[in-house]
Amino acid sequence: MSIKAEEISSLIKQQLEHYDDKLDIEEVGVVTYVGDGIARAHGLNNVLSSELLQFDNGAYGIAQNLESNDVGIIILGKFDDIREGDRVKRTGRIMEVPVGDALIGRVVNPLGQPVDGLGEIKTDKTRPIESKAPGVMQRQSVNQPLQTGIKAIDALVPIGRGQRELVIGDRKTGKTSLAIDTILNQKGQDVICIYVSIGQKESTVRAQVETLKKLGAMDYTIVVEAGPSEPAPMLYIAPYSGIAMGEEFMYAGKDVLVVFDDLSKQAVAYRELSLLLRRPPGREAYPGDVFYLHSRLLERSAKLSKELGGGSLTALPVIQTEAGDISAYIPTNVISITDGQIFLQSDMFFSGTRPAIDAGASVSRVGGAAQIPAMKKVAGTLRTDLASYRELESFAQFGSDLDQATQAKLARGRRTVEVLKQPLHKPVAVEKQVVLLYALTHGFMDAVSVDDIARFEQELYTDFDANHADLLAEIKSTGKLPDENKLQEALQQFASSFSSSNK
């Protein structure tokens, strides 16, 4: 069979019509050094800062140091099978993590991969871990309270939705417990919680996840876990991954609480990476941009304007101090970035005052505006009363001849300290806190012995739940104190029955 020349030419024309002249150009570098979670690569001349890079073995890295002859890369995940001479290519993207409702109730690593053994996370939404914080005009003032359920915080250092409140203290002073209790209290408050664990022991994180599950808090919580055995880059990116997951909900108009436990370990991981990348060390061997490390993270916490949906992201960063030294480099940095701090003191903790919140050193710079009017009224003088009690207490040790007024102040102070104590994982609803503090400030506890204050508190809640639920409901719905005559009458009835049963 002979093929005609015109048929050949028409076939060639057809082929040429459908020919797609597309070239895939990849910029590829060669690994010249690898170790301790970092790599150096030669040949990536056009790579951008913070660009995501991919190694031959499928592992990813982030370009950190752009130098004249090579690029310093931090490796995300295992680096055992990356060798000198391996290829590394540009992706043209920046690091992103999966986000959305599918992550709620799950435990993930900083890359958003599940580590809880409950199967893959089905979501097609992602967000970059680094994003610009909302500007001044995209925000509004903090105006809604975030109830922690911890009496000492809600009364003395109130937190608002969209605020950044630092939790600071030595090791073993109850910082993590305080954060977990705050998450537990968000049940039924329509707040999504994200707990970012940085460098915490895996057994500790497991125990916390079990606590959250047992008390029904995993229904609205995501846990991001970077254990101490993970390479330093994972600890470094963990907070950014956590806040990116939170931003997805914030920009959807929801309220989010993100706990970073703790940022001291992230700073140490960043110091390690910076020294390995041969960046010049500064104070305490931290690099010069360690302030920016935390400021660019915490500035992403905001209460968005109504035009953007009015969502909020509240940040609770945790910082560990050494021997109560809050004037060290990282603590002072984070104190200056945040809107207040809750200082936990080891002396108070070991003497049995738990939560061990030092009312004198703790402050909330914006939360007062978000406090409900009823709480503002009953807790108004509490801080000054506590401060004067501490002062009087130190003077009272030197002499026993105290006048009546001073003795009354000391007695009220002892009861105040006792009222602010709280057992672990037992958050108190704000309306009950208001009633309790009203009873304290109006003298209904003056006749109760200090040892009986805890029992007085529990029986007061039981009595109000049974006989005065309307008063509690009114405080909850309006945020204001109910008719004071009714409230005083109810408290008088209870106080008289309590004291008579004690005689």
Curated annotation (Swiss-Prot):
PROSITE patterns: ATPASE_ALPHA_BETA
Localization (cell): Cell membrane
Record EC number: 7.1.2.2
Molecular function GO terms recorded: ADP binding; ATP binding; proton-transporting ATP synthase activity, rotational mechanism
Signal peptide: none
Predominant location: membrane
Annotated membrane topology: Peripheral membrane protein
Biological role: Produces ATP from ADP in the presence of a proton gradient across the membrane. The alpha chain is a regulatory subunit.
Protein name: ATP synthase subunit alpha
